[in-house]
Amino acid sequence: MVRKILQKYGIRGGCHDQHFLIDERSLDSIVDQAELSEKDVVLEIGGGIGNLTERLLEKAGKVYVIELDPALVHVLKDRFSDNEKLEIIPGDVLKLDLPKFNKVVANLPYSISSPITFKLFKHEFELGILMYQYEFAQRMVAKANTENYSRLSVNTHYFADADIIMKIPPSAFSPPPEVWSAVVKVVPRPSSFHTEDPQFFLDLVTAVFLQRRKKLRNAIVKGNHLLNVPNIKQIVAELPEEFMSKRAENLEPHELAEIANFIFKMRSTS
């Protein structure tokens, strides 16, 4: 059926991250993981030709679909013109104000996975079932002292619990991408540790992972253009050596928060 739709509208995909999921079992599993009911308002980002949209509409009470490509917007409108539960929002998800939703289910455009994810974390929702490039998903769920531990890992841990629940081969898509994909279950929650200023903490995480091979002492000083702390060298000198002699990849999220809190307090009192 999916291949017939592609042929009908003359859509080949392959550009602008257009790799359409055509494996019926994978599509069904993604929707099952969302545990949808008529009470749910679902956001789908990148509706494509509507193969996931169709399944969401069968179970959810309301579905918002954001789609950038005008040709695909036309397909969605044509396929679901009689379905009152669907609202199609044409445009760039990074530039749009998101509607209110409680669940997000999407095959995200891989080239902008990071900014989309961080934008979602700024909104309240109960559950996300999100498909990413497999390597990106690995970095999302990575722990400290592992190869994939990164800014993305820390920020994800700050906002939510995240687990890889499915791994999907290239053959499940048309056209097949060059990489494997993964579905990540994201459950937002309050942070498990305190931050004096959340944005300052996120900026510090960015700063130290930009210099991830440097010891933290040097990484913070080098990344101070993101922190704008006038007396940064003096403050860093007062931080515990057990932290400063390590690299960012060796510190747990709560330890990075302790460092951010100390610097923020010292900056505020100087």
UniProtKB/Swiss-Prot annotation:
Matches recorded under SMART domains: rADc
Keyword Cell cycle among UniProt keywords: no
One GO cellular component, as annotated: cytoplasm
Disulfide partners: none
UniProt function note: Specifically dimethylates two adjacent adenosines in the loop of a conserved hairpin near the 3'-end of 16S rRNA in the 30S particle. May play a critical role in biogenesis of 30S subunits.
Gene name as annotated: rsmA
Family: Belongs to the class I-like SAM-binding methyltransferase superfamily. rRNA adenine N(6)-methyltransferase family. RsmA subfamily.
GO molecular function: RNA binding; rRNA (adenine-N6,N6-)-dimethyltransferase activity
NCBIfam families for the chain: ksgA
Protein name per the record: Probable ribosomal RNA small subunit methyltransferase A
EC number: 2.1.1.-
Compartment(s) of residence: Cytoplasm
Keyword RNA-binding on entry: yes
Residue numbers binding S-adenosyl-L-methionine: 19, 21, 46, 67, 92, 107
Assigned keywords, A-Z: Cytoplasm, Methyltransferase, RNA-binding, rRNA processing, S-adenosyl-L-methionine, Transferase
PANTHER family given in the database record: DIMETHYLADENOSINE TRANSFERASE, DIMETHYLADENOSINE TRANSFERASE-RELATED
Recorded superkingdom: Archaea
